[in-house]
Structure formats: C-alpha cells, structure tokens
Amino acid sequence: MEDKNNDKEKKTDVTFEDDEDNEDLEDNSSKYENDSETDQSDLGDLPGDAVDRDDDIDEPFISQVQWPQSFRETTDSYTIAASPIFGSLRSNPPSFYRASRSNLDVESKAPLLPERHDDSDKASATQSAWSHKGSFAEELPIGGYGCSVIQTIFNAINVMAGVGLLSTPYTVKEAGWASMVILLLFAVICCYTATLMKDCFENKTGIITYPDIGEAAFGKYGRILICMLLYTELYSYCVEFIILEGDNLTGLFPGTSLDLLGFRLDSKHLFGILTALIVLPTVWLKDLRIISYLSAGGVIATALIAVSVFFLGTTGGIGFHHTGQAVKWNGIPFAIGIYGFCYSGHSVFPNIYQSMADKTKFNKAVITCFIICVLLYGGVAIMGYLMFGEATLSQITLNMPQDQFFSKVAQWTTVVSPFTKYALLMNPLARSIEELLPERMSENIWCFLLLRTALVASSVCSAFLIPFFGLMMALIGSLLSILVAIIMPALCFIKIMGNKATRTQMILSSIIVAIGVVSGTLGTYSSVAKIIRNYQ
C-alpha cells in the first residue's frame, strides 16, 4: 500500500511540474500580449515619425519547420571544447533538453510542420518563450559565463584547422605558387561571410542556427537545402577520415594484409575496416561530451604536425631546396577545392557565436582565427613543397621518412586525431534521420544501434569506392564547402538584410556569390573529371 501511495505521489509531482511548465509558458505568452498591448497604446502618444520607426522593426523569427530539431544540440559539441569551468555551457541541461524534443529520452515528438492556431499572436509568443527557455546561450549572463575571446578563437581553430592541413603542400605542386593567392583570397572571403552570418543573427531575434538563417531567407525550402548541405558535408568528412586512416596506417605498417574465407584484404582496405570497428563504439554513445573534450586536442594535433614538418626540414637532413613553377593553370581548380575545404567552419560558427559571453567581439575572434589558420596552412604548404618538390603526395605525412622521430610524431598524430572527431561528425546526421522515423521505431535501442552501424558501414564503402584523399577533399570543398561557406551566407545576407544593408555590403555580397558559383563549378568539374580518369 505504501508503494502504491508513493507511486501516486510521484505521478502527482510529475503532473504538478508539467503544470508549472505550462503555466510558465502561458504567463510568458500573456506577458508578451500585455507588453504588445501596452506598446500599441503608447504609440498613440508618439509623433508619427516614431511610429514609423517602430514599424520598421522586424518581427522575431519563429521557425515554421520543425526538422531538424537536434541540429544545434548535436553541433554544440564543438563549442564546449574550451568552455569556461570545463563544461559550464551545459550547466543547465533540463531547460536545454526541453527545447530539443527530438531527444531519444523525450516521450513525444513534435510534427515536422506545426499545427495552425486561430490565435496566431499567442502561439507565436508561446513559441518564442519556449525557444527562449531552450537556449542555453541566452541563459548565460554576460560577464559571468560563456566563452571569452581566447576560448572562442580556440574553438573556431579547432573546427577549421584539421586534415586539410595535410594537403596544402600538394596544392602547391598541382597549382604552383599561385595557389598561395587562392589561400589568401578564400581566407578573406570566408572570414567576411562569417561576419555576414553574425549580421543575420543580430537582424532578427530567434535566428540561432545556420538552418534558421536559411529559413529566414528562403522559407522552409531554404532550411531544408542548407540542412542537406550540412549533413552531406559532415558525412563526407567521415568518409575522408576512413581514407586518411587507411593511407597513413599503410605507411606505418606497409605490406600488411589479411586472408579470410578466400578473400584477401590489402593494407588500405584492412585498416579502413579496422578504423570503422574502432570508431563504432564511440558512435553508439548517447553522451558525446567526453569525446568533445578530447576533440579539443585537434588544435594541439594541428600544431604538432606543423612543428614536426618544420623540424623535419631543418634537422632531419631533408632541407628546403626544391623550387616550383609560379602557376600551373590546370591545377587551379584543385587548389580552389582544397582551400574551400580548409576554410569551411560555417556550419558551427552560429554555435560558437551563441556561446560567447560578449558577442560584440565575434568579428575580432573570427578575424584572429582566420589569420592563424592562414599562417598554419601557408606555412605547412610552403615548407612541405620546398622539402619534397614534385614528389609531394596528397598527404604530407606520406612523404615523411619512416626512420625520423618527427615523422613518427606527425604520422601518429594524424592517425589518432580522427578517432576523437568521427562520432561528433556522424551524430548530427544520425539524429536528424531518427527525427524522420516513426516514434516507436526511433526510440527503440536496436534502431539506435543499427542506424549508426549502417551509417559507419556506408562511410567505409564510400571510402573504398573513392579512395583518393586529395581528389575527395577537392570535390567536397568545391561541391559542398563553397556552397556552405561562401555562396549561401552571402545569398542569405542579401535576402534577410534587404534595404538595411549598405550599398557596399550588397555589392561585395553579390561579387562573393559570383566568385563562389564560378569557382565551385570549376572545382567540381575538375575533381569529378580526375576521379573518372583514375578509374579509366
């Protein structure tokens, strides 16, 4: 009897808590209504020009498409790598998880399209209140919590400076020293488009993520398009990691093979499969915060590789003696794809912006981040090509002599780093697919495991189908990264800002769109043609 009474009390408590949440939402809704009525009544006492200025203020952005609901949560893993007090950005999980109804622990799912209500103002206010409660970035008091400028720079570099560093010397081989001009040009353009995204956030309250920008600019189809681009880009990074592991482990353990049931696996295929088996348990994890902390080592890994290249050239008996052509026109499209890949961190920049304690310093942090990345990419590109010349391979680590200490440091750093990032890249795609499944199926643990296993297996198959690291990177950069980092931010800025943008901003944004379309087309065509040529 006591147990039954306790159960009843628990049920009563849960119901009471739910009622409190509902009352909070209703109170917020009525508060917004009262505030709006007060504002309207006050307008009658104001001069006509003041009324006109109030009419110019945009209404808060409220998403009308509920897919994907998990995008911000799953990409926030990148912004807690250098969070203050090591994870304080997650200090208030209950309100955060209430906002993400797609979480597997939630008992019910929201429809992809919200139901229409007669009282649209009240519904809008309620949704705004719900959005506010679910935004941990808005809950962070300025000056008390949130990332500082240095932490923001660290997080941004952790997102951008990755495996693209390995292929920068190869771009000099393919395109000549003129590729350095493309390196600088794309850095300036991508840095500018990152600041355009900030302007979009500040123009309308309620724009939190990159998909929100797409919807605010072009409606639900804009949101879906950007989501598809982002998820495809994240998935392609996972494919690139499998290729990377196969190539570098083959260099460390040449001649390795396996004969099993009449099938012979060479070293690249064997290590690709082993890599998938190692990362699979990390993809099965529901809480990826530990992995996100480990992924913060990506900045250290990038620095280690750059330092290793320097010391290998100065003390390893290799030297910097090679020279090259000023420009190789046939390789320019390849360089476009590689550097498009290198500077594409825009999918996570919104999360980084929202995590800042002082958002007014976002531009300063982004500019600093891009300057550091230019120095890293440019330094390794120049040193790597001067060391190996026309013998430079698609990954600088494959050129390094096996008997050198700094070669081992760079190679093993390259091998270990992707294991801390693979799950973080695959998780957003897996969560978005779960949102589209029926509720009973998506909440089943076997569905959870099988879906992620299938995604990992498909990434391995894709890596085996296109096992060309450099060409795959150039294709990703030309086809996806240029769209994500150059074309779409500029287009969305033009659409969202409209007459509020200055003439200079509109002209620059239009030029950037044109550059993105031309360079993306050239790079994609060149990459696809070279991949086909490798199969002929």
Swiss-Prot record:
The keyword Transport applies. The keyword Transport applies. Residues 1-68 are annotated as: Disordered. It is found in: Membrane. It is a multi-pass membrane protein. Keywords: Amino-acid transport, Membrane, Transmembrane, Transmembrane helix, Transport. This is Amino acid transporter AVT1A. The lineage of its organism: Eukaryota, Viridiplantae, Streptophyta, Embryophyta, Tracheophyta.
